[in-house]
């Protein structure tokens, strides 16, 4: 029983990831016990309200979700939102692919 899960199916799992200076984020991969759950990736801005801009969508099957080229700035970061439909669904982890500028 590793990974994270929700206590109520109305909840979502959220992760925020800094994009290190001098790098570009290009892909996100997420693994989970149910490989069909929806993953949404947003480029966020620390100086703005709301969810930001959607840069990619996919599922929890571990396949790379292309997010284009999200260059690091002084105000941006990534938010990954995973929607699950059961308290038994677990998210084991994920990776963000970075390239050096």
Q: Where are these predicted regions, by residue range?
A:
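Short proline/glycine-enriched turn/loop motifs at strand-loop junctions of beta-rich domains
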Residues: 23, 33-37
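Extracellular carbohydrate recognition and processing domains
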Residues: 50-72
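Short, surface-exposed beta-strand/strand-loop-strand elements in extracellular ectodomains
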Residues: 36-49
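Extended extracellular/luminal ectodomain segments enriched in beta-structured repeat modules
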Residues: 10, 19-27
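Extracellular beta-rich ligand/substrate-recognition surface
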Residues: 1-12
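Noncatalytic modules at the cell exterior or secretory-pathway interfaces
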Residues: 69-92
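Short edge beta-strand/loop segments characteristic of extracellular beta-sandwich folds
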Residues: 16, 29-31
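C-terminal interaction-tip segments
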Residues: 14, 85-101
């Amino acid at each position: 029983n590793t990974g994270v899960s929700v206590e109520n199916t109305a909840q979502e799992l959220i992760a925020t990831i800094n994009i290190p200076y001098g790098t570009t984020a290009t892909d996100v991969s997420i693994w989970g016990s149910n490989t069909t759950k929806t993953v949404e990736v947003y480029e966020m801005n620390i100086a703005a309200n709301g969810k930001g801009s959607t840069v990619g969508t996919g599922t929890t099957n571990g396949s790379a979700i292309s997010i284009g080229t999200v260059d690091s700035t002084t105000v941006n970061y990534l938010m990954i939102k995973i929607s699950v439909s059961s308290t038994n669904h677990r998210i084991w982890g994920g990776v963000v692919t970075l390239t050096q500028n």
